[in-house]
Amino acid sequence: MTLIELEQIFKKKGYDMYNFARGIDNRPVQISRERKSVGAESTFISNVYFDSDELNEHIKDVVNDVCKRLDYINKCGKTITIKIKYADFKQVTKRITLKSPIYTYEDIFKNTNILIEKVKNKEKQIRLIGVTMSNLLECEKEEYHNISLFDKL
């Protein structure tokens, strides 16, 4: 239908319907839900094996991205999920829920590697690695202060 026909039938709503049907919607996006997870993933240019240096570098990059995203929204997570997609496009996920929330690179990297060890298959090549933090909570990050032994002398 033409714009004129829609406006004759539906009045002002006809104009909106005409634009919506063409993917045009200039209303501001209202985000009304709270984020439930933060994740990142990386696809390899060519498939790699579990014991490759390239996999380890991608894991570091993905965990770093997750940490930055957690920091940006000031959240910590209790559940870590890894996703591994193999060269044959079969996919496996593994997760662990911790007693306390974490947010540091070291903690997320350590737990990611624990999960990877549980699904490791040295004979299969990997196409993609992903890490997601969920069960998010407001983060009260500890401030670390350097304490000198000589302050009290």
Where are these regions (language model features)?
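DNA-contacting surface of Y-family translesion DNA polymerases
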Residues: 1-126, 136-152
